């Protein structure tokens, strides 16, 4: 990853990953986050081009700021997670719409959309 970030030194970089490196505030999901997240952030802090982090695994749309980095997640096209902050296990939502994200890239700009599906 370091080599690729170095090669993209003059570009804005959006990093995609399955497990989030950031905490979500949802205890059960935070237990499943990237195991070496400290190493991950130590690595990307050496570069000024990382602009946004996008991850899966959460099965909920959310965005925020963590360690100085903007992040986004999207709903799943399959099943959603119940929004519980103090749960020790993941629980699937019943009857909640599926969804997905669309990222429009336009040169050095980007826009992130969230779309729900019945």
Residue ranges with predicted function:
Residues 1-70:
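His/acidic metal-ligating clusters that form di-metal
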Residues 43, 65-118:
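Binuclear metal-dependent phosphoesterase catalytic core
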